[in-house]
Amino acid sequence: MTAEFDEEVVFENSPLFQYLQDLGQTDFEICPLSKEEEHLAGNGHGEQDVHTTEKKSNISRTVEFLKSWSPLFSKKKRDEKICLLENGFRLESLRTILQQEVLIQEDVELIELLDPGILSAGQTQNQQNGHLPTLWSIATPNIWEMSVLFAFLSALAALQSWSISSSLVWGPSLILFAAFTVLRALHTWRSATLRMILRKYCNQVEGTVLNSRAFTNLVRKALRLIQETEVISRGFTLLLDRVSAACPYGKAGQHASQHLLGLRKAVYRTVRTNFRISRLATLYMLKHYPLNSEIDNVTNYICVVPLKDLGLGLCEEHVSEEEAHNLTDAFSLPALKVLFQLWIGQSSEFFRRLALLLSPENAAQGHLASPEQLPHLIWSDVVQDLPHTQAACLAELKRSYEFYRYFETQHQSGFERTAKRKKEVGELSNLHGAVRSLQLHLKALLNEVIILEDELEKLSSCKEMQAMTQEASLMLEEKLRIIQPHVQASNTCWEEALCQVGRMVRRPAAKKDIEKSSCENLNFPVVSNMPPALRIEDRDPVPEEQILEAYVEEAVTDQEFNSEDIYLFSPEERERQKREREESKRVLQELKAVLGLKASEAERQKWKQLLFSEHAVITPFLPEEPVGHFEPPDSVYPEDPCKNLGFYGEFTSEINGTEHAKDTPNQGDLQMNMNHEDEAKICPLSEEAEPESGKDENESPCPVPRTVLPPAIKERLARIHQTSDLNFTSGLAAQVAARSLTFTFLQEQTFGDEWDDDDDDNDNDDDNYDQVKNVESHEKERNNVSLQLEE
C-alpha cells in the first residue's frame, strides 16, 4: 500500500468493496492484505480468538436450552405465538392484494424496487408461512408443559394413601397444577380470540380488495355501455349480430350526453366518492405510519396533488347535481373517463402503500414495539369506513347499470307495448338496427376477404412452393375462421330485416281494402327467384374502390306516415316529430361524411356497367329450370284484370316460345317501332302503350311497367352486339333482362321455326311483315270485343 492516500484504491473484502461489487463497478484497484497481517492472523492471536468463540458458543447454547425449559421465560414463548399469528395475517393480506391484481404495473415495479420481499411473500403457498395458524397448532402444549403434567401425575401415583399427613405433599402440588392449568387455558383462550379477530380482519381485507376490483370492472362496463350507445346513435355498431337496444330509433336525434343520463350520474357519484375516501386513507398512512424516505417520496403518490388541480368537482365535499353537470360538461364521456383513470391510479396507490406497510421486513424492524404497531390494528385504523363506503357505491352503481342494461332495453312496460305509434317506432328501430349491422358486417367481411385474397396471391406468386405447406394451410384456415362470424352475422341481419319488412307490409294490407293495398304495392319491386351467379371471371373489370353505402334516402317527407294516424297526435307531438326527423337527417349527413362520399347516379351506373362485363352477359349461368317461367303478382295492375292477365299471358308465352307471334297484340307495335333506324334501337313497352290508348279514350290505358330499360343499358347492349340493327328477338330478350333486373342470366330465346335461320334476312323481313298484319287484325278484334263489353 502506498504512503499517500489514493481514492481509487479499495481494500479487498471491505464494506466499500462489497458495495461497489453490488453496484457492478469493477474499474477500481484492489489492495490485498499485507503479508505481516496475514502472518499475525495465522499466529496464536487467531488461535486464541477461535477457542474463545467456541467457548462462547457452547455457553450460549446451554443457556438457550435452559431458558427453553424454564417456565420463567414462558413470556417469550407466548410472544412467539402472537408473532406467528401476526405474521400469518401479514402474509395472507399480501397474497390477497397480489392475487386479485388490484395493482397497476407501475406500482408492482415500484414494490419490486423498494421491497422485493413482498412479491415473494405474497406468492407463498405453504400453510405454515402463508396462512393463519390453526387453533390446534396454537393450543398444542410444548415440552415444558408436558413435563409438568407428567411430574404431577407421577407425584400422585407415588402416594400410598390419601391421608391428612400426605396432604403436605399433594396439596401444594394440586394447587400449583391447578394454577398452571388455569394460566395455560387463559393463554390458549387469548390466542384463539386473537386468531378469530385476525380471521375477521383477513376476510375484511379480502372483501375490500374484491369490492375494489368489482367496482373497477363495473365502471369499465358502464363506460363501455355509454360509449356503445353514443356510437350507435351515430350509425355505427360493435362486432355483434345485432346492435344494442339501449339507443332506440326514436332517440337518434338526441344529444350524446342525453343518452343514459342516470347511469352517467351514478358513475360520477360513485367514482368520486371512492376516489376521495381512498385518497384520505393513503394520506392517513403517510402521516401516522411513516416509513423510510425512499418509500414515502412524494413524487410516487397522487394523493399529494391538490384536488383543485385535478378539477371535476373533487375538491368539494358535497357537489350538487347542477354543479357536477357544469364541471363535467354535462357528464360527458371524456370527463368520466378521466375520473375513472384517476380512480384506478388512486386505488392502486392505496393498496401499494398498504402492502409496504404490512411487509415482513417492517414487522422485523418494529416487532411489538407498541400495541398500535400490530398489523390488524393498523388496518383497522387506516381503513375506518372505507369497506362500507365501497360496498355501498358498488351496490348503487350495480343497480343503475342493471336498470339501464336490462330493464329499460328488454323489459318494457305494457303501456309502451300497446301504444300504436311506439310500436311502429320500435319496428323501425329494429329494421334500422338490422340494416346498420348488415352494412357494417359486410364492410368488415369485405376487408377480411381482401386480406385473404392478398395472402392467396402471395402464396401463388411464390415459385419455390410447389405444394402448400402446413403453415400456409393453418394460416388460411385461421383467415376463414375469422370470416365465418361476419358471414353468419350478415345472414342473421338479412333474415331479420326481411322479417321486419314482411311484417310492416302485411300490417297495412289487413286494415285497408284490396284496391288501395294493391295500389300501394306498385311501389315494391319484384324480387326474382333466380339463383345468383357463383363466380366472376378474373378478366372482368371491377371498380378500384368499392364503397359500401348504407343511408336513408334524403327524400323523406311526412307522407311516410299514414294519414289515419295524424289525428292521434297533438300539435306539440307533431312538431316534436318534425324536429326529430330534421335532426335525424343531420345525423345521417354526418354519417355519410364519415363513411365516405356519396357516389353520384352516373358513377354508380358506370360501376354497374364495369361490373357486368361482356363475358358475364354472353356466358350466362344456366339454372335447372327455364328462366322465363316466372309469374308477376296479380296485384300489380288491379284496374283491368282481364287485360292484365291477357297481357302477361301473351308476354310470357312469347318468352317461352309456346305460341306463335300472331297471337300477341303488342309485338306488332314493337316491331313497327323497331324498323325505324333513325329512332332508338330498343323501345320499352311503356312507349308502345300510348298509340293504343289514343284509339279509345274510354278504355283504361295499359299501366306502365315498373322496370324501364335505361339509356345506359341500351348503350351497353348496342356495344355488346356491335350490330347496326337489333331484330325483334334481341329487343324482346332485352326487355326480359330488364324486368328480371339481372343481366347475367340473359338467355337467347327463339320464337318459331321460321326464325332459326338468322342468315336469311329476306325471310325474316317477310315473316315480320306477316306478323305485323296479324297483330293489327288481332288488335281490331280485341277493341271491338272491349266496346261490346262496355255497352
From Swiss-Prot:
Protein location: Cell membrane; Cell junction, Adherens junction; Nucleus
Tell me which InterPro entries the record gives: Myosin-bd, Vezatin
- An example Gene Ontology CC term for this record: plasma membrane
Q: Biased composition, Basic and acidic residues: where in the chain? A: 773-783
- The record's region (Disordered) falls at 752-791
Superkingdom of the organism of origin: Eukaryota
- Please indicate if the UniProt record lists Coiled coil as a keyword: yes
UniProt feature coiled coil, ranges: 435-464
How is this protein situated with respect to the membrane?
Multi-pass membrane protein
Cited function? Plays a pivotal role in the establishment of adherens junctions and their maintenance in adult life.
Assembly and interactions?
Answer: Interacts with myosin VIIa and the cadherin-catenins complex.
Q: Give the similarity note.
A: Belongs to the vezatin family.
The name of this protein is Vezatin
Taxonomic source organism: Xenopus tropicalis (Western clawed frog)
| Taxonomic lineage from the root | Eukaryota, Metazoa, Chordata, Craniata, Vertebrata
